[in-house]
């Protein structure tokens, strides 16, 4: 086991600073909410995408824990497809007590990376979040995530409000 210095970034955008979000998806691309709240989809994406980025906190979760997570009334899971093929996902959680929306996880399956699908997912997150009328949207990312993650957030107007360096054991 070796230790890495990992840079973690917390980003925010105040919704009053957002204009109209015009999301135009490429042909055959769709983004739909998982209305069934099937924890298996969250688990699948977490494992498949996370393996390349050291996502491992949830790997020890039981199916019962996964199910409880997916059934959280404030959580939504959105799935991107190209035709019938899975491309990526994101999870958003509304925090009513703070009047904010958190982007918990977002990722693209390996075969679809580097094709701007992350940008479309982030735009979709912003657009869907505005339906809740939160004061702010926020996300955290780190140096282990995809190299375009941080630039993607910044390009949409998110600003870093907190940075930290942690030791991470691989």
Feature map (PLM): residue ranges:
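Short acidic/polar active-site loop segments enriched in Thr and Asp
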Residues: 76, 135, 159
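Short amphipathic alpha-helix that is part of the acyltransferase structural core
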Residues: 23-58
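Acyl-donor-binding surface of acyltransferase catalytic domains
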Residues: 1-35
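Conserved GNAT acetyl-CoA-binding A-motif
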Residues: 129-141
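Conserved beta-strand-loop-alpha-helix junction that forms the acyl-donor binding cleft
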Residues: 139-149, 166-170
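Conserved acetyl-CoA-binding loop-helix of GNAT-fold acetyltransferases
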Residues: 105-108, 114-129, 150-155
């Amino acid at each position: 086991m070796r230790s890495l210095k990992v840079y973690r970034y917390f980003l925010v955008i105040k919704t009053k600073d957002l204009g109209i979000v015009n999301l135009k998806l490429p042909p055959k691309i769709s983004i739909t909410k998982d209305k069934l709240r099937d924890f298996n989809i969250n688990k699948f994406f977490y494992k498949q995408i996370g393996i390349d980025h050291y996502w491992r906190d949830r790997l020890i979760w039981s199916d019962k824990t996964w199910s409880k997570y997916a059934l959280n009334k404030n959580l939504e899971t959105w799935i991107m497809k190209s035709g019938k093929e899975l491309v990526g996902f994101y999870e958003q959680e509304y925090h009513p007590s703070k009047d904010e929306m958190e982007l918990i996880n977002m990722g693209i399956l390996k075969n679809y990376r580097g094709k701007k699908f992350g940008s479309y997912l982030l735009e979709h997150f912003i657009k869907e979040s505005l339906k809740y009328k939160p004061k702010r949207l926020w996300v955290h990312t780190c140096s282990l995530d995809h190299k375009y993650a941080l630039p993607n957030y910044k390009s949409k107007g998110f600003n870093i409000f907190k940075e930290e360096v942690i030791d991470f054991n691989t």
